[in-house]
Amino acid sequence: MSSHTPEIAPSAVSSLISSKLHPTPNTALTLEILHNLEHQHQWTALKVHEPFSLSAEQAIPLISGTPPQVVYTHPDEQAYLLEHHIRPEDVPIDREWVIPTSQGEKWTLRRLAGIHDSLPKRTEDLQLGSFDLEQASKDMQEYIRLKKEKPWGGKRALLAMVNSGLGGDGTVVYYVTMEGTPKPRQN
């Protein structure tokens, strides 16, 4: 009787992480979240921004990319869309920023503000891509103009938190973080 144990192939995430020469914990965490965004949530145009590549405040890697649908709509923007009968699925999708973190990692307002300070202005994240502005309705053209001039809300990013306890289970939870505070809605 042979006691041959079949070899278990490494997961796609493990293979991605081990493809780096000397992966640091931050690199491994960032790649795990990048893999989750690409394969679980179908984000495109993903890019890792190495520490300090955006500013001196950016001490950790950040991820940017395009989600398949709008992640967050500011209450004032939502009111504008409703008032002008613009369907949310017709709105161009902004590039979004992701802050990789693990469960239990210590965060302060100063650290989070430093990350937000390193992000580009929201007007730079508007991606029109294949959107044909000339064919759009007047309301949609006005919406795009307003969004380019002064976007609703300040800078924002998704805080991607990985469950790292006991080796983790691959779960990633995303929290929307924003610069400043949105004003309360008026009913």
Question: Which residues does each PLM region occupy?
Answer:
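Acidic, polar low-complexity intrinsically disordered regions
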Residues: T5-K155, G165-L166
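Helix-rich interaction surfaces within compact, conserved domain-sized segments
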Residues: I144-N187
